[in-house]
């Protein structure tokens, strides 16, 4: 398993992986709902490559992408120290340490950029993800009540964050 920063050459595989992960019904987009072409993904990746406090990390196994982590930074000086995280792992690789490895690589990268705060949201009933985030040091900061509607039911999201020390 290799964890690395994504390049625009990964755009097609990354788009496919994101669609696969969304089949879990635990992401913001419902299965099949995200409409992003490979070209749009490429442009998005090119834009993120130019931002000092943004990056995309991928987990690769035998030349196949099996996980991703978007670190989306900010440019205003008052919030430049934080990044918002979006993470996904292919179903058959969950529970095998891929998420831990992605976050470990993220933290190395973040410390080099003086990023202090990592933040994310997660569906409250996504117990495996919440457990992973707590295991690696994230804390629940609050609840976004009824923030998503999945299969006709309102569900809560948790705000979680981790403060890095360096």
What residue ranges belong to the model's regions?
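Acetyl-CoA-dependent GNAT
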Residues: 8, 34-92, 103, 109, ...
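Conserved catalytic-core motifs of GNAT/GCN5-like acyltransferases
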Residues: 79, 119-123, 134, 139-155
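A short beta-loop-alpha structural element at the N-terminal edge
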Residues: 2-16
């Amino acid at each position: 398993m290799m964890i690395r920063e994504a390049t625009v050459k990964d755009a097609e595989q990354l788009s496919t992986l994101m669609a696969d992960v969304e089949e879990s019904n635990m992401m913001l987009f419902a299965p099949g709902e995200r409409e992003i072409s490979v070209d749009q993904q490429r442009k998005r990746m090119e834009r993120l490559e130019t931002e000092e406090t943004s990056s995309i990390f991928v987990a690769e196994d035998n030349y196949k992408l099996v996980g991703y982590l978007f670190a989306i930074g900010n440019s205003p000086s008052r919030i430049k120290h934080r990044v918002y995280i979006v993470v996904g792992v292919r179903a058959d690789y969950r529970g095998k340490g891929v998420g831990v490895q992605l976050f470990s690589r993220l933290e190395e990268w973040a410390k080099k950029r003086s990023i202090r705060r990592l933040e994310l949201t997660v569906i409250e009933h996504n117990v495996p993800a919440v457990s992973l985030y707590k295991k690696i040091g994230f804390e629940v900061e609050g609840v976004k009540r009824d923030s998503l509607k999945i299969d006709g039911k309102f569900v809560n999201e948790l705000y979680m964050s981790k403060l890095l020390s360096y």
